[in-house]
């Protein structure tokens, strides 16, 4: 069995934020294996939190014992979810809500938090009929409120894990893939591989796809910018007018909420990260 000190890689974020693309890119690296979503670990992390009570401690099961049991389960799932590799990776979007727990269980792990314009995220959920708990597709504005709640918590946790969590903007990744992938591999202490720019050519070989993942069909294509503007003209004027109220973290993250057709070229600027402060 692998130890708790393995340099595991976790990829998370609000669903439809580019997590599947990110894990496909990582899977293309010769030393990394992610595989598809387990669709289990976020629920398991929620379950284990409910058992961390005084009742458990009073029964003689200390947090250390409980942590060992929890990490043993998670490690087995990740390790036997596919072929072994020098660096193992997990992509379940909502693990991003459990970063402090992951930090404690796996002190040498690294986390990639994917960030994407909420308008594109929510349009994707609605258009592709992706069922995500807590998102009511018949009420657009409530979906923006839910996104804001989740990304706020994810960002807070990521910002409290310096050196262990990196934020990756989807809009930059697809416009400046080589620079961004090099930034990511540096963070992960991996040697950069040109294969990562061509993940689509390795589908079925280095990169296994899970047909249950809603983005599986999309990542069969090369990295492209087609999805950047797919949400244009898809929201009501009333919804767009209220964005700063229902999803204030859009502007905090640098997205232009004043335009119904924003220009994403700023995310490709060479000095982009110089202007990312607490939330970047």
Swiss-Prot record:
The record marks 91, 215 as: Transition state stabilizer. Its EC number is 2.8.2.20. 3'-phosphoadenylyl sulfate binds at residues 16-20, 116, 124, 128, 170, 215-224. Belongs to the protein sulfotransferase family. Pfam families: Sulfotransfer_3. It catalyses: L-tyrosyl-[protein] + 3'-phosphoadenylyl sulfate = O-sulfo-L-tyrosine-[protein] + adenosine 3',5'-bisphosphate + H(+). This is Putative protein-tyrosine sulfotransferase. It comes from Caenorhabditis briggsae. Disulfide bonds join 34-89, 158-165. Catalyzes the O-sulfation of tyrosine residues within acidic motifs of polypeptides, using 3'-phosphoadenylyl sulfate (PAPS) as cosubstrate. The active site is at 37 (proton donor/acceptor). The gene is tpst-2. It is an enzyme of class 2 (transferase). InterPro entries: P-loop_NTPase, TPST-like. Glycans are attached at residues 57, 136. Gene3D superfamilies: P-loop containing nucleotide triphosphate hydrolases. GO terms for cellular component: Golgi apparatus. Keywords: Disulfide bond, Glycoprotein, Transferase. One of its GO terms (molecular function) is protein-tyrosine sulfotransferase activity.
